[in-house]
Amino acid sequence: MYEYHSKLEATHPWQSSWYEWPTMIRPMYYYCQTLRDGMKEGISAFGNPLVWWAGIPALILILLPFGRRRSNRLGSKTSQWLQSIGCEFLVFLALWSVFVKQSSSNGGGDSWKLYGPFLIVLGVASALYIAYQLVTRGDKKALFMVFAYAVQLLPWILVPRCTFAYHYFPSVPFVAMMIVYCMVKLVDSDKKWFKWCMVYLAVAFFLFLVFYPVLSGQPIYEQ
């Protein structure tokens, strides 16, 4: 599997990188056909903006409590230092993957073949250490959602081949869970948030109805 994904050099006009998926910068376009009577049908792959975009602040809000909690145990400073090193390495790994994507599109990619396995091992070790710190310091429910989301998304950082927006779909259920988790926390802190949460859900459902024809291939009038 690694050999296939690391050596595939094909490109596609609708390809997109992992860092573009949460913001839907490059959706996937499958099919379009003009029908009789001024109608058209098409199939695309993209998400609900109010779900995918809201997932970004939801993830940040979930991670903030982890950063605020302090440990009084002996060696906590060393632990925090190691955790910061792990986070910095994951950021470096993400930036490296962007560089590899660009070099591969220009005919390069030898750097990934040389350093790829080593970076994978360090990336997994850093992620596991950070996960251990979150387990001992944070909310277990929030940790599960963040960990599941990361497991679905982060491996694509290590894939130099062309990728598409639909590779993000397995992460979307956990995005929705993180949004609901944040909504519950907001409502618990202040009941006034309840009506705004209901407005958000109603608008998100409305957008689903609006986009459904171009997601499912339902014929619609061109205008």
Give the ranges of each region predicted by the language model.
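Transmembrane alpha-helices of multi-pass, membrane-embedded glycan-processing enzymes
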Residues: 54-58, 123, 175
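Alpha-helical transmembrane segments of multi-pass membrane proteins
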Residues: 121, 148, 169, 173-180
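Membrane-interface helix caps and helix-loop-helix hairpins in membrane proteins
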Residues: 158-165
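Transmembrane helical bundles and short interhelical boundary loops of multi-pass, membrane-embedded
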Residues: 77-138, 178-180, 185-223
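Alpha-helical transmembrane segments of multipass membrane proteins
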Residues: 153-157
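Physicochemical signature of membrane-embedded alpha-helices that form the seven-helix bundle of GPCRs
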Residues: 167-168, 199
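Lumenal/periplasmic acceptor-binding loop at the mouth of the active site in multi-pass
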Residues: 1-70, 96-99, 105
